[in-house]
Structures are given as C-alpha cells and as structure tokens.
Amino acid sequence: MNGSMPFHKYSPYPPVALANRQWPNRTLTKAPLWCSVDLRDGNQALANPMGPQAKRRMFDLLVEIGFKEIEVGFPSASRDDFQFLRDLIEQKAIPDDVTVQMLVQSRAHLIERTFEALQGAKRAIVHLYTPTSSLQRRVVFGKSQQEIIDVAVEGTQMIKEHAQRSPETEIVLEFSPESFTGTELPFALAISEAVQQVWQPTPAQPMILNLPATVEMSTPNIYADQIEWMLSHLSDPQSIIISLHAHNDRGTAVAATELAMLAGAGRVEGTLFGNGERTGNTDVVAVAMNLHSQGIDAGLNFSEMPRIIATSEACTGMSVPPRQPYAGELVFTAFSGSHQDAIRKGLHLHKQEQAQQWAVPYLPIDPQDLGRHYEPVIRINSQSGKGGMAFIMEERCGIHMPKAMQVEFSRVIQAVTDEMGRELQADEIEQLFFKNFVLQENPLSLGHVEHREETEERHHLHAQVSYAGTVQALQAHGNGPMSALVNALETFYSMTIQIHDYHQHARTAGRDSEAVSFVQISVNGGKPTFGVGLHTDSSRSALEAVLCSINRALATSLT
C-alpha cells in the first residue's frame, strides 16, 4: 500500500449559495411524519426479497410500531406487489389511520395498473418519481431538462385524472425528483413547481414533495442547505410537505436527515435499522430514538426492541449489527472498567434518588425504554475493572461487596479472562464468586454451633469444627460470636488470626432473607483475604465467613 489513493479522480461537491441560512439556529421540537419504505426500497435491496407471508408480518409490525404511512411496493411493476396490496385491501388489513403508498413511473399503463391495485383503499399516496440528475439525464436518458419536466407533468396529469375517477379513495400525490442531490437546484425547483401547478394542492390538501438523497454525495449540512433553498424558493410552500429520503453512502444519512428537518422538512422516509440499496436508507429507529433522547415524543414505539429485531431479521434475512444504534446487542454494553464503574454508580444513584430525569454515565437513554435489561449492560473481559463484577453480583445475586473485596475479586476475574482469552458471562462470574469466596471448606468447616450472650461484651461459643476431616468440639469466650470463634481457633490450632474488615447485609428484603457476611482475615501475619458467609442466621453467616476467609488465607500462604 505504497503511495496515495487516486483522489484526483473526484471533485468536491459544490456548496449552496445561501446568504441567510436559518437552519443552524433552530432546534428540533417535534417529530416528523414517518413513512416506512421497508416493503419497497428495503425489500428490493434484499438478496432474497420477502414473500407474501413475510411482507404481511412486516406490515403488521410497522403498523404496531406506529407508522401511519407505509410504502407497500411497486404494484405496476411487480405482480407480487400488486397482489400484496390487493390482499391488504380485500382482507381489510389496513387500519383507518394508516395510508398505504405505492411507487410508480410516469407511464400511462403503469399509472393505470397502480390505480387498479389501490381500488377500494380509503386513502392512498401515489408516489410519482422522475430521475432528474444531470448525470442520469446525460448518461441514462439523453433528455433535456424540459423533456424531463414534460414527462413529470404528463404523469401528474394522468394521476390527477385517475384520482378524479376514483372518488371513493382519497389520493395524495407524492413527487420525487429522483437523485435530487445530483440535480441542479434551479431545475429541481422548476420541475417541482411544474408538478405543483398541475396538481393544484392547497394547505388543507397538500402534496408531498420528496427530495431524496438517492445517492449521498455531500456532507449533511449541504443537504440541509438544499432543503432550505427549495423551501425559500417554492411559490406556495404552505401547500407542500417536504419529505426526506436519504441514503447512507457516506455514512451520514441520519445526520443529513436531522439537519434537513431543521431546514424545514416535515416528513421522513426510511427503514428499520437502515436496510436499503447499497449502504442502506435512513435508519428511522435511530432518528426516532434520537428525538426520544431529547424528550420529544417520536410517535413510534420501540419499547419491545428485541421482538422488533427478531421479526425484522426473520422477514428480511438481514441481521442487525451488534453496534447498530439503539438496537445492536452491544450498544448498551461496557467492557471498560472505568465505564462499568461509572454506570454502576449512576444506576445506583438513579434508583436511590428515584430520579425522574435519566442521567447515567455512558448510557444516553434508559435501556428499559427499549425492552432491554441492565444486566447485559456490563460485560466482563480482560479490560474490565472491579465495578463491572460488583454490578453483576449486585444485580444477579443481591450481593454488595465492600470496595476492598471488589479489588480482590477483580484479580480472580482478571486471571481467568487472561487464561481463557474471552469475555465471561454473568453466570460464569457468579460461579467464580461462589467457588472462590463462599464454597471454601478446606481445611476448616463449621458444624453445629451454640452461643449465648453472658453479658453485653461477653459471649460464650461452642462449635464443632472439622479440620482436614477431623471434627473437634471447640469452645471459647469473646466479645461476640466471631471473636469467640477466632479465640477458639487460635488456642486449639496455634494460629494467629487478625480480623481486618467485616460487613454484613441482608441479601433480599423480608424476614427470611439470607445474611451476607464479608470478613477479611490474615493468618500468622500473612496477606489479608476475604471470605463470605451466607445463612438465614446472621451469626452463623458471620462464622462461616470467618472460616472461609481463614481457608483462603491458608491456601494463599501455600502458593
């Protein structure tokens, strides 16, 4: 890979001369009209297009999500699309508040076939498109600007005449100068005005002017400039709904759509997860959830995201990438130790304060808004720190480790992840915790225990303790059960035992909850280690933690 790439083959996209642009100073405050093109633009981009059952399943999903306008296909060019639309109408599957949309070219027999397909629909959008870019005019069609305008005008007139002969169906016209971003703005304006002049829309019955980035050719700000330029030059913008249909060739379809909305567009066409030709369409999930994250009702409901993903993948055969915004498996996941610690603390504070406003580090929205859970937010690999393991144990097991023990547990996890070379699942972390800090019964284990409080500061303990399989009956006094057990062990086994730290909490709410005890002990001046005890009797829990800690300390001294 020596030398530079052949960048000289390309020319910069020309900027728009916009003397007094307004969109940079605006803020989005409401959602646009949404139109799903999953069943048309999305479907045509599939290696294996959807069959009738998959299309119906997708249509029902889109309705459930809340789309009020759905492009169902190209019925004049596809027998399958024609039959699908007929089935929707005849089976009364289109809710009264949902409008179906169909694509058509400016040809008499195609327009006629389109109206045959939509017969009986309550309301329909007929989407007329005409390629207008300078490149297509020169390379594909060999037509002049006026010839292209004539084609669009003729098609509009035919649609208008068919609409007048179909009074039972409310017909809305949508016109797209295809490849708008590759079209000279004055020509895009001229052809749009010519179509508007024929259709004669009003503010009460507007037409849709769709200005697509059929191929994404520039930075998003230029697309916004183009939209603002068109709106400022249209003769009757009050009778026009400016619609967007951005492709993702440069990877900025969502940004281009958002900036173009600031420029005055009121309608967005796109697909779930950005499926579409080449690099895809605008991802309506991302645009809608971006609005949601700013406190704006997007009008679309993605609260059951796992089910939406499963349905989409089953219908399209396309998988949702793990880092797809808002939807991917890993978008609410942190592997970094510092990120995990911040998330854990943020979630704890949010719950503690019962906060109404969401504010958790590294989580721009609440995963539960999308039907996701907190547990997968933190995943453990060799880069993870103590906060991640602590979070998982708190969420899964109700075990809240003291900070010093988090450090000790993180060393255990680090050693395992380094050895295995992969991340650990939550159940594996739980198993490692119990294996290393709870189920340590060698050489010491605790049998029957009796203790009584003689005075407030003097307790008597009688305990059966097994050492390497040999059971001994021990007894001693101390200022509490733990102190008495330590005194008994020191006397009988000639150990020097020092307790450095002790914590205890209830594992769950309620009278029958287990007590979780954490005891940090050093033996014979060695390295302090933690042990954990779990029992419904709080005293027994603490005593088991003492023996577990001693066992771990003895094992450490031998390594």
From Swiss-Prot:
GO terms for cellular component: cytoplasm. Gene3D superfamilies: 3.30.160.270, Aldolase class I. It comes from the Bacteria. Its main location: cytoplasm. Its EC number is 2.3.3.13. Homodimer. Residues 440-559 are annotated as: Regulatory domain. It holds the Pfam family LeuA_dimer. Catalyzes the condensation of the acetyl group of acetyl-CoA with 3-methyl-2-oxobutanoate (2-ketoisovalerate) to form 3-carboxy-3-hydroxy-4-methylpentanoate (2-isopropylmalate). Keywords: Amino-acid biosynthesis, Branched-chain amino acid biosynthesis, Cytoplasm, Leucine biosynthesis, Magnesium, Metal-binding, Transferase. It is found in: Cytoplasm. Residues 32-306 form the Pyruvate carboxyltransferase domain. SMART domains: LeuA_dimer (SM00917). One of its GO terms (biological process) is L-leucine biosynthetic process. This is 2-isopropylmalate synthase. Pathway: Amino-acid biosynthesis; L-leucine biosynthesis; L-leucine from 3-methyl-2-oxobutanoate: step 1/4. Its cofactor is Mg(2+). PANTHER family: 2-ISOPROPYLMALATE SYNTHASE, PTHR46911.
